[in-house]
Amino acid sequence: MTTLTMEQRRADFEAMLQRANGMRAAGQKRREMYPEADGLMLARLTEEVSDLCHGWHEAAHRASTGVLAPYTVGQVKKHALQVAAHCLAALRDRDPDGYLESAQREGHLSLRSRDLGMPPSVRIGRLITYLGDLAACFTDSYDPDGEIAPHRFRALTIEAICVALAAERGLWQEEEA
């Protein structure tokens, strides 16, 4: 079982969120020069989540067999931060002033055990579920006022940040009690 306090976990969450926001800021100029259509944005995010899920599965398997390389860990963290950065960019487009604070606040409220170890199938299932929730509200008929999508982007952001934290801590499986 982890010896991290909730205060340490929150500080780690904030630091990782800042790293993702740095990635978002680095890509901001390109996004302004080449805006994406909504369908392309969702397709790109789907590909990023897919890469993250595949990477997590591979890393968890390699960790269980004792052949996990630092490169693989770095790739999983990179994929997780890309997903979070993509979601933060979408949130910033909707709320340029408060996007980061709202993600941070919701992250603190919903950390629970999401940044710790869990079975790979659960971790991957959660990522796919949050992506599916986001995709479902991406049409005007489901969310005509655009009020649901920000919550879905924040949920996927938080999950991706928690995946990056778990990868950084080497928590590929459910922790032993």
Predicted segment positions?
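Flexible "arm" and connector segments at domain edges
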Residues: M1-A177
